Regions:
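Small-residue-enriched flexible segments
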Residues: 1-176
Length: 177
């Protein structure tokens, strides 16, 4: 499947040594173990925090304080370069497995921040949350995406040498990844 084109004929389909601008190309994988890796392209900023008040997809409090206040304070502590990334690539990572002592790449399910309400001090995200869950703010940039992808590939290659790969990308992870 080739998607994302603005008009028919723009996507390129590859079949053996041919490059096509229409039609379809299929891949059949049989009797081969598959391993999926996902580079979310985000790196954590600040510290992990526990949601203390939330309703549906709206985080009202983190650690007993207004979520927006914590977000504003975090912004002030960042270097200028990271503040620029923060303004266009801020995400929230929700911990997948709470039963760990510390968290690292792959331990978070990354979600978009869909809005903030400065008056109420709340943050809305693209997922339902509940009190007691651990979150951490993340920023998305191409350097993080590339580093995380390289680490995941190295970890996977230690088990066996890959014979092939399928790569799916998006602009949020960086145009050059």
């Amino acid at each position: 499947i080739a998607s994302g084109a603005q008009a028919p004929g723009i996507s390129r389909l590859l079949l053996d040594d041919q490059s096509l601008d229409s039609g379809w190309v299929g891949v059949r994988i049989c009797n081969t173990p598959l391993r999926t890796i996902v580079s979310q392209g985000c790196r954590p900023i600040g510290d992990p925090m526990v949601i203390t008040q939330a309703e549906r997809n709206i985080i009202q409090q983190l650690g007993g304080r207004r979520a927006f206040d914590i977000l504003s304070e975090l912004f002030q502590t960042l270097p200028t370069r990271e503040q620029r990334i923060f303004q266009s690539g801020l995400q929230i990572g929700r911990v997948i497995n709470e039963y760990q002592d510390s968290f690292q790449y792959g331990d978070f399910l990354i979600r978009n921040i869909t809005g903030v309400d400065k008056g109420l001090g709340s943050i809305s995200i693209g997922d339902y949350v509940r009190p007691g869950q651990t979150i951490q703010f993340h920023i998305r940039d191409h350097e993080s995406a590339s580093a995380e992808f390289s680490q995941l590939v190295k970890t996977g290659a230690a088990d066996s040498i890959p014979k092939a790969a399928l790569l799916f990308t998006c602009n949020g992870r960086g145009l050059n990844l």
